[in-house]
């Protein structure tokens, strides 16, 4: 058979992993890659290619990076394709582009739809304490993440998982599912299944304000919040005007009479903070203007900017 011609749209590492799988499939030809423009990163604000762009260049694939994908319609329309495949592209793809492929435009989405439509499904699954999440391969339609899905597979969320780990696990699952099912979709062997609109929930992009830790919450919710934002963008808290980033905590069984947010102990193990119903112990913390470090350094190195009795806001 002729190779399946794919236009791929994606930006971060999970998209790069899906693109890598497509380039390795003998029955697939990636005819175009579309990614977000390069962005300045780091303190020097140097332009860095997206992970998807790096894979495209490595495989000598044609790539475009429009500020708005709608402005690239004419260029995309000139390229014959069977599928548009997207994964974490980061822009709405207009209907006139979705209608270009001969077969379909499909999305590799990081949730068990209709749960968590939107841009942060992995973060929301962890934040809400879900025990499972998964990948849905779905038809792309004008309405965000509302298309029928061809197939879903679930995966457990372990207590040791954070968003970074789940991105890696879901990328591997998505790779497997694309490899096993793209030809089936091409051959019309997977009838699409409508989403149950009564069960729809959303996962909007997380704002900077929503990254702030609410110490006046249950310990389990504080723990889930922090691991949902690890290793990026990282949860934060304030002591006065100083912002501290907290990347990892564990739940303690201790409880004392103290205002939520209060530092109740500093030991070789970490920094213990009172919550609404108990305590969590900070394991990884970043002081303003410094690098992330183990919280045990406060005791071991006699650091003085935090002390027992101080209270995070």
From Swiss-Prot:
Gene3D superfamilies registered for this protein in UniProt: 3.40.50.12230
Taxonomy, superkingdom: Bacteria
Pfam families, per the entry: Formyl_trans_C, Formyl_trans_N
Alphabetical list of InterPro entries matching this protein: Fmt, Formyl_trans_C, Formyl_transf_N, Formyl_transf_N_sf, Formyl_transferase-like_C_sf, GART_AS, Met-tRNA-FMT_C, Met-tRNA-FMT_N
Residues that hold (6S)-5,6,7,8-tetrahydrofolate according to the record: 111-114
Keyword annotations of the record: Protein biosynthesis, Transferase
Record EC number: 2.1.2.9
GO CC annotations on file: cytosol
GO MF annotations, alphabetized: methionyl-tRNA formyltransferase activity
Catalytic reactions on record: L-methionyl-tRNA(fMet) + (6R)-10-formyltetrahydrofolate = N-formyl-L-methionyl-tRNA(fMet) + (6S)-5,6,7,8-tetrahydrofolate + H(+)
Key word Mitochondrion present: no
Keyword Transferase among record annotations: yes
NCBIfam families cross-referenced by the UniProt entry: fmt
PANTHER family: METHIONYL-TRNA FORMYLTRANSFERASE, METHIONYL-TRNA FORMYLTRANSFERASE, MITOCHONDRIAL
Family: Belongs to the Fmt family.
Its job: Attaches a formyl group to the free amino group of methionyl-tRNA(fMet). The formyl group appears to play a dual role in the initiator identity of N-formylmethionyl-tRNA by promoting its recognition by IF2 and preventing the misappropriation of this tRNA by the elongation apparatus.
Name under which the protein is recorded: Methionyl-tRNA formyltransferase
Organism of provenance: Mesoplasma florum (strain ATCC 33453 / NBRC 100688 / NCTC 11704 / L1) (Acholeplasma florum)
Gene expressing this chain: fmt
